[in-house]
């Protein structure tokens, strides 16, 4: 049976503690079952789809994940459309898509890094305020100024 040996077990630097003795640092690469003669490699299961994470069986998480992916693809397709055909409809579509994309992304940051009921409620309220102000600002910019498409074109032209 093959074995994986750490480098620290090969280098002896004087006295080593009990937990770091060479005999405790040798770990088997393959695990052998007592009932069978064949050995099985240790493997990790990698989940690539959101359906493996939906523990309650509801479709809300899957639909949300699908919506995020559709929005990401829509943003990818809006970039060339905004460059070749700038119009108010594309400006407002970009404003809505960018705001929603940012809202969902920052919502995941809040979910991952904010702990405690009161802190989560405050962070979500702040996120809603930020998303609302962002969308209102982009709509104001589209209505009273040149719009998102022409503004980016002006940045590239200078």
Swiss-Prot record:
Domain of life: Eukaryota
Gene Ontology CC, one term: respiratory chain complex II (succinate dehydrogenase)
Cross-referenced InterPro entries: CybS (IPR007992), SQR/QFR_C/D (IPR034804)
Binding-site positions, heme b: 101
Keywords: Electron transport, Heme, Iron, Membrane, Metal-binding, Mitochondrion, Mitochondrion inner membrane, Transit peptide, Transmembrane, Transmembrane helix, Transport, Tricarboxylic acid cycle
Entry keyword annotation includes Protein transport: no
Membrane topology (Mitochondrial intermembrane): 85-89, 142-158
Membrane side Mitochondrial matrix: residue ranges: 30-62, 111-119
Listed GO MF terms: heme binding; metal ion binding; ubiquinone binding
Quaternary data: Component of complex II composed of four subunits: the flavoprotein (FP) SDHA, iron-sulfur protein (IP) SDHB, and a cytochrome b560 composed of SDHC and SDHD.
Protein name: Succinate dehydrogenase [ubiquinone] cytochrome b small subunit B, mitochondrial
Upper classification of the organism: Eukaryota, Metazoa, Chordata, Craniata, Vertebrata
């Amino acid at each position: 049976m093959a074995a994986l040996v750490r480098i620290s077990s090969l280098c002896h630097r004087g006295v080593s503690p009990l937990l770091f003795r060479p005999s405790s640092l040798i770990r088997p690469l393959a695990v052998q079952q007592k009932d069978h003669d064949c050995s099985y490699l240790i493997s990790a299961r990698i989940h690539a789809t959101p359906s493996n994470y939906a523990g309650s069986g509801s479709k809300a998480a899957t639909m949300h994940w699908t919506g995020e992916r559709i929005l990401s693809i829509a943003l990818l397709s809006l970039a060339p459309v905004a460059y070749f055909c700038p119009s108010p409809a594309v400006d407002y579509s970009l404003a809505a898509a960018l705001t929603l994309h940012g809202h969902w992304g920052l919502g995941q940051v809040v979910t991952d890094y904010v702990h405690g009921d009161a802190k989560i409620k405050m962070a979500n309220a702040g996120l809603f305020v930020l998303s609302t102000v962002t969308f209102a600002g982009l709509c104001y910019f589209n209505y009273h100024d040149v719009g998102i498409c022409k503004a980016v074109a002006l940045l590239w032209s200078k």
